[in-house]
């Protein structure tokens, strides 16, 4: 997403055939641009969140 920086990306093939990607980073607070933020089941404190937005941008670009 805009302004968000991801270290660990995962490519997911969309139904239309084009690649989309999702950030696998576990963060203490989601970036404001993230619209689908979910708390993860981790033993860490504070809690970790993952942004589940599907971003059509190339994961290699910051």
Swiss-Prot record:
Instruction: Please indicate which superkingdom the organism of origin belongs to.
Output: Eukaryota
SUPFAM superfamilies, alphabetically?
A: Bowman-Birk inhibitor, BBI
Q: Does the keyword Disulfide bond apply?
A: yes
Annotated GO molecular function terms are: serine-type endopeptidase inhibitor activity
Found, by tissue, as follows:
Expressed in bulb (at protein level).
User: What residue ranges carry the coiled-coil annotation?
Assistant: none
> What Gene Ontology biological process does one annotation of this record name?
negative regulation of endopeptidase activity
Q: Name the cystine pairs.
A: 5-59, 6-23, 13-21, 30-37, 34-51
**Keyword set for this entry?**
Disulfide bond, Protease inhibitor, Serine protease inhibitor
Q: GO CC terms on record?
A: extracellular region
UniProt site positions, description: Reactive bond for trypsin? 15-16
Q: Which family does it belong to?
A: Belongs to the Bowman-Birk serine protease inhibitor family.
Function, as annotated, reads:
Serine protease inhibitor. Inhibits trypsin (Ki = 65 nM) and weakly inhibits chymotrypsin (Ki = 295 nM). Does not inhibit bacterial subtilisin.
Query: Know the name of this protein?
Result: Bowman-Birk type proteinase inhibitor B7
Q: Which organism is it from?
A: Hyacinthus orientalis (Common hyacinth)
């Amino acid at each position: 997403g805009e302004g968000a920086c991801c270290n660990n990306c995962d490519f997911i093939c969309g139904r239309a055939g084009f690649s989309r990607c999702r950030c696998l980073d576990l963060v203490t607070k989601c970036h404001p641009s993230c619209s689908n933020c979910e708390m993860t089941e981790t033993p860490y404190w504070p809690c970790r969140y993952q942004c589940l937005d599907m971003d059509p941008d190339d994961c290699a670009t910051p």
